[in-house]
């Protein structure tokens, strides 16, 4: 139980310290989504949905860009999403290593 509590404490503290960067990446994802949505004539909700599905690299295929600019921005959205995910995973790994080293 102590390992879990320590992990959560370290993980949340790490996320807090890098929250400005994470918020910037989220803002980039939202802005690109709205640009693509306007360019493709999607609703704002559909554009936001597409942006986050693309950023987490799921890509259901129900919305897909048809225009060249939108296709380029979709690649950028996926790259930003991979960076976002990598940062969160790195923080989680650091928290796990530190908490395990302390208690195990």
Predicted features and spans:
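Membrane-helix boundary elements
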Residues: 1-16
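Membrane-interfacial helix-loop-helix connectors in multipass membrane proteins
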Residues: 4, 103-104
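Membrane-interface helix-boundary signature
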Residues: 12-19, 70-73
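Outer-pore turret/helix-boundary of cation channels
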Residues: 20-50, 65-68
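Pore domain of cation channels
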Residues: 46-49, 53-103
